[in-house]
């Protein structure tokens, strides 16, 4: 059959297929490296480089198997023997419908399944072309079942693996010995699965024809060799690296404590007073410790029964003009000791501190229902108010702690400063001099917005004896120690590469499956499609996926790596390994499972095991709803394009 008249459709199909691959890369590749970026083991740029390599390799070696299911397993192509041009138009429609919906979802940062898109689009054009008889409904039922099986299976495998790791490694007082013993096993399992997948699916591409037992034997042998290499070289190197890191952190901690102790001894007798400060000025604002006045504090604490007073501050601000100390130099404070053992400082109302703290410290007014104290943090142990003020102006984060029990003023939220989330550049600043304070004020004035807010600020900085509520069992969240982070750092990178490889093999079919069908129909002049999937078409799809990742991938990486649940290297390793294992198995048996479903199932399962409240269930609900919405929406887009193309092809045929 002469197909030259439909060359325009093939050209259009290639263009749309690249756009579809672009959308797959922008949306689905986040499943592979999202957790690695979220746990901090790789940067976004490093993730893009690694994903580009492994996505392309996986698409070439594994993509042919699933591509056959996409292009021949969902619809009965034999019904189009007499109307080949209709099937070609349908393949173009399927790509358009899938690409449009995935681009919209990527723009909205909504992670959806590329498999859902292409399946729904294929069904949509078939219903328009020849009605419901063109759809192989039993195949569709199997695919729909896999949408539920894949997250459950992946989540179950991830959960079991994480429980074992937590039991034998994470909960140990010294996790290093058990972790080092398990490293060869972890690496061997990852390599074995990967090698088996390549040889089983990619053997025709490599020119090999081996029985399955031979492939399994080779995979097992390669895994043993790799495990021996890890045990012989990687484990001793990792042990030295962990010991060096711990020794360095211990030395830094000792030096920091010694430095703070010396400064505290030198500055504790009193506070400096700046020129222009008038303690008797009625415009001054008291700055005081509320450690003994907070709700829940004992009477003994208020009476000063502790051997040393806890230094904190409470800043009560009222509406009024504020001027920078750079312009008028009217910043001052003076310490006053009351008989309750607390130190009271006075801050001039017209000083720059008023304005700067007003704009730099944000009060969470939505926490009135929970006045109890959060975890204790110590910002600094020093009595130097310059240090506190400069740190606050530079943007120390604030967490709500308790409400002041001051009956003379309206109840307002109180907060404490937390110093564990400040950028490295901010930590390097000096906070203990007047010049550093003035520099911070000058920078803050440039960034500050005009306006005023009434607030009361309190921060507890130094009292380790203050009672605090332990988090409930549901609120507890396990965090990796420094040595555990190092143990699983490289493992998560390896499993992320493995997941990217599996993703390339599974999801390249979503973009290239219809294009392969379109190309084979045009080349052979029929719908039989007996030829194997061309490798260069798989490579073409891999390039499109990588392009989408570099341009738009970071939008969904944020959702998968950070928003759904916090990720650590240990939990990220289990998520990556179990979900990738599920995807590779599905790819090898030709079942187009969704990598999104596998990864979401693993993330939710491990996050729920780590902490009952660590999972963003609202986001999970939205993703779950999107799984159902994608198929009909993509089908509607495809059906509309199919109707348009059939109209155009009808005009074209009549004109000939």
UniProtKB/Swiss-Prot annotation:
It is found in: Cell membrane; Apical cell membrane. Residues 257-283, 459-478 are annotated as: Disordered. Glycans are attached at residue 81. Brain. In the brain, expressed in the choroid plexus, ependyma and arteriolar smooth muscle cells (at protein level). Widely expressed including intestine, kidney, heart, liver, testis and skin. Expressed throughout the vertcal crypt-axial axis of intestinal epithelium. One of its GO terms (cellular component) is brush border membrane. The chain crosses the membrane at residues 6-26, 47-67, 110-130, 143-163, 191-211, 214-234, 484-504, 532-552, 573-587, 595-610, 623-643. It comes from the Eukaryota. Residues 1-5, 68-86, 131-142, 212-213, 505-531, 588-594, 644-655 are extracellular. GO terms for molecular function: sodium:phosphate symporter activity; virus receptor activity. Keywords: Cell membrane, Glycoprotein, Host-virus interaction, Ion transport, Membrane, Phosphate transport, Phosphoprotein, Receptor, Sodium, Sodium transport, Symport, Transmembrane, Transmembrane helix, Transport. Disruption phenotype: Mice develop basal ganglia calcification and display significantly elevated phosphate in cerebral spinal fluid, calcified optic nerve tissue, moderate to severe hydrocephalus, poor skeletal development, low body weight and significantly decreased postweaning survival rates. Juvenile mice exhibit abnormal endochondral and intramembranous ossification, decreased mineral accrual, and short stature. Adults exhibit only small reductions in bone mass and mineralization but a profound impairment of bone strength. It catalyses: 2 Na(+)(out) + phosphate(out) = 2 Na(+)(in) + phosphate(in). One of its GO terms (biological process) is positive regulation of bone mineralization. Residues 27-46, 108-109, 164-190, 235-483, 553-572, 611-622 are cytoplasmic. It is a multi-pass membrane protein. The modification Phosphoserine is found at residues 253, 256, 259, 268, 316, 385. Sodium-phosphate symporter which preferentially transports the monovalent form of phosphate with a stoichiometry of two sodium ions per phosphate ion. Plays a critical role in the determination of bone quality and strength by providing phosphate for bone mineralization. Required to maintain normal cerebrospinal fluid phosphate levels. Mediates phosphate-induced calcification of vascular smooth muscle cells (VCMCs) and can functionally compensate for loss of SLC20A1 in VCMCs. Belongs to the inorganic phosphate transporter (PiT) (TC 2.A.20) family. This is Sodium-dependent phosphate transporter 2. It comes from Mus musculus.
């Amino acid at each position: 059959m002469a197909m030259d008249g439909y060359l325009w459709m093939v050209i259009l199909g290639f263009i749309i297929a690249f756009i579809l691959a672009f959308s797959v890369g922008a949306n689905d590749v986040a499943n592979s490296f999202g957790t690695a970026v979220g746990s901090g083991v790789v940067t976004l740029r490093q993730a893009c480089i690694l994903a580009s390599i492994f996505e392309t390799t996986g698409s070439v070696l594994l993509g042919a198997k699933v591509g056959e299911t996409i292009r021949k397993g969902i619809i009965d192509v034999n019904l189009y023997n007499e109307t080949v041009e209709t099937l070609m138009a349908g393949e173009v429609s399927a790509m358009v419908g899938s690409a449009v919906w995935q681009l919209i979802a990527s723009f909205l940062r909504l992670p959806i399944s590329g498999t859902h898109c292409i399946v729904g689009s294929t069904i949509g054009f078939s219903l328009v072309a020849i009605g419901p008889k063109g759809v192989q409904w039993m195949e569709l039922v199997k695919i729909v079942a896999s949408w539920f099986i894949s997250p459950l299976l992946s989540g179950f495998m991830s959960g079991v693996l994480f429980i074992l790791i937590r039991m034998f490694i994470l909960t140990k007082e010294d996790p290093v010995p058990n972790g080092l013993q398990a490293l060869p096993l972890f690496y061997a399992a990852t390599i074995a699965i990967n090698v088996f997948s390549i040889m089983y699916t990619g053997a025709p591409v490599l020119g090999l024809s081996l029985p399955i037992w031979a492939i399994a034997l080779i995979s097992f042998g390669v895994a043993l060799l790799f495990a021996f290499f890890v045990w012989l070289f990687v484990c001793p190197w990792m042990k030295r690296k962990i010991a060096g890191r711990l020794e360095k952190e211990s030395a830094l901690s000792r030096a920091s404590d010694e430095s703070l102790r010396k400064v505290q001894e030198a500055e504790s007798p009193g506070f400096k007073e700046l020129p222009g400060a008038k303690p008797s000025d009625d415009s001054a604002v008291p700055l005081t410790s509320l450690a003994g006045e907070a709700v829940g504090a004992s009477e003994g604490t208020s009476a000063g029964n502790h051997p040393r007073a806890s230094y904190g501050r409470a800043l009560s601000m009222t509406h009024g003009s504020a001027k920078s100390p750079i312009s008028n130099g009217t910043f001052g404070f003076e310490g006053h000791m009351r008989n309750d053992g607390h130190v009271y400082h006075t801050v001039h109302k017209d000083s720059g501190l008023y304005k700067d703290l007003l704009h730099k410290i944000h009060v969470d007014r939505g926490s009135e229902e929970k006045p109890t104290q959060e975890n204790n943090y110590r910002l600094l142990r020093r009595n130097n108010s310059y240090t506190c003020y400069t740190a606050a102006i530079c943007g120390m984060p604030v967490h709500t702690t308790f409400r002041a029990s001051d009956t003379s003023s309206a109840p307002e939220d109180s907060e404490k400063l937390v110093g564990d989330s400040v950028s490295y550049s901010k930590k390097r600043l000096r906070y203990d001099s007047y010049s550093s304070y003035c520099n911070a004020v000058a920078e803050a004035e440039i960034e500050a917005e005009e306006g005023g807010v009434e607030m009361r600020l309190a921060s507890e900085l130094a009292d380790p004896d203050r009672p605090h509520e332990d988090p409930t069992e549901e609120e507890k969240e396990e965090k990796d120690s420094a040595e555990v982070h190092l143990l699983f750092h490289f493992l998560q990178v390896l499993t992320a590469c493995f997941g990217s490889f599996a993703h390339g093999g599974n999801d390249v079919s979503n973009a290239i499956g219809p294009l392969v069908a379109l190309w084979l129909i045009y080349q052979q002049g029929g719908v039989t499609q007996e030829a194997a999937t061309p490798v260069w078409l798989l490579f073409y799809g891999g390039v499109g996926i990588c392009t989408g990742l570099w341009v738009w991938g970071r939008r969904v990486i944020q959702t998968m790596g950070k928003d759904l649940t916090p990720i650590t290297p240990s939990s990220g390793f289990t998520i990556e390994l179990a979900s990738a294992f599920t995807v590779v198995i599905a790819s090898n048996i030709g079942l187009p499972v969704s990598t999104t479903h596998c990864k979401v199932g693993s993330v939710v399962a491990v996050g729920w095991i780590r902490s009952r409240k660590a999972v963003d269930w609202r986001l999970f609900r939205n993703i779950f709803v999107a799984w159902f919405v994608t198929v009909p929406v993509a089908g509607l887009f495809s059906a509309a394009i199919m109707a348009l193309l059939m109209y155009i092809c009808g005009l074209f045929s009549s004109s000939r």
